[in-house]
Amino acid sequence: MQIVTDPAEMQATADKLRAGRQLIGVVMTMGALHEGHLSLVNLAREHAGTIIMTLFVNPSQFGPGEDFQRYPRPFEKDAAMARSAGVDYLFAPTPEAMYPEGFQTTVSCSGITRRFEGERRPGHFDGVATIVSKLLNITRPHVAVFGEKDAQQLALIRRINRDLDMGVQIVAAPTVRENDGLAVSSRNIYLTGDERQKAPAIHRAIQHAGEMLAAGENDLKAVAAEVAGMITENTQFKLEYAAFVDEESFEPAETVVKEHEYRLLIAAAAERVRLIDNQKFRV
């Protein structure tokens, strides 16, 4: 595995790979790697022969009071995990390299981002859209793999890829879960012991939503309300939202239309970390 820190060098390397007819797959991370990230690498390998992993804690997607300074950065461990997973190039630039003096451009997508995470984290998705656009331009991939756990982010990336004619195949990877159902996340280390015990209640509530829909419930607002009640009752987390959206448009959905796909989105705040989860349903 080759470690690259200079954007120009990474871009030149990617251009050479493309000239040699190598299919490039990219997996973007902020480090603190876990099994979820490794599953993205495995999926990327099914679509491409050369895998680039980006490792960059992006300051522009963190808001005031968020965890940019304390976000874990175990670089040596991450590099070892990437190497063991079969990553060919680890692109790990500095903030100064990605946002040099005089940098002025922001990529913004107003529709998909105006609710849910976008409403609660102002500026977050502008930071995501900007850095993803830059990293796609630098790594020149044919395929980019992103996890479904960050569903709104995935919808945003699909939209900017489409709107800006980037021509990258965006592949969605299923959420990886712990044995008790908790979605794997680098930030789970912030949970206290008691919070960690109660956190799987979120996934149980999602499963209950699936049971309600399978039994013929058509009122998505009622299903979401029951999900919210289960989470509030079984945890001390502050529920921020539990809502269904149309899978294609990401607009809020209230009533089932048969043979249609919806996604249940959930966010709940523990003492030091926000937990997000989601699930797609076809009804």
From Swiss-Prot:
User: Which residues constitute the catalytic centre?
Assistant: H37 (proton donor)
Reactions catalysed, semicolon-separated, are: (R)-pantoate + beta-alanine + ATP = (R)-pantothenate + AMP + diphosphate + H(+)
Q: Which InterPro entries match?
A: Pantoate_ligase, Pantoate_ligase_C, Rossmann-like_a/b/a_fold
Q: What is its main location?
A: cytoplasm
Pathway it acts in? Answer: Cofactor biosynthesis; (R)-pantothenate biosynthesis; (R)-pantothenate from (R)-pantoate and beta-alanine: step 1/1
- One biological process term in Gene Ontology: pantothenate biosynthetic process
Positions of disulphide bridges: none
The Gene Ontology CC terms held by the record are: cytosol
Q: Which GO terms describe its molecular function?
A: ATP binding; pantoate-beta-alanine ligase activity
Is the Chloroplast keyword given for this protein?
Answer: no
SUPFAM superfamilies hit by this protein: Nucleotidylyl transferase
The Enzyme Commission number assigned here is 6.3.2.1
> Where, per UniProt, does this protein localize?
Cytoplasm
Residues that bind beta-alanine: Q61
Residues binding (R)-pantoate, per UniProt: Q61, Q153
Q: Which family does it belong to?
A: Belongs to the pantothenate synthetase family.
Per UniProt, subunit arrangement is: Homodimer.
Any further remarks?
The reaction proceeds by a bi uni uni bi ping pong mechanism.
Could you identify this protein by its name? Answer: Pantothenate synthetase
Species name: Chlorobium luteolum (strain DSM 273 / BCRC 81028 / 2530) (Pelodictyon luteolum)
